[in-house]
């Protein structure tokens, strides 16, 4: 009986995974347009960013999620968006594996 309970509690840990960041729907990345898409549209599409920062005086938002699995490899996707002084997308970069 003790062996069974040990297996029941340890098995999920063996199959476990870890996640860092905040998942986001990457389906709308194709709709981002430089000098057109606004911060409000980005929030509507992706939610609140995982990180906010500043790059050369411009607002920069990062959407990032990394998922590690005990069995398998790392799943990762990231979207970095730089906004101009009118709160429109100046540039962006999306990567996933």
Language-model region placement:
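C-terminal motif of bacterial Sec signal peptides marking the signal peptidase cleavage site
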Residues: 13-16
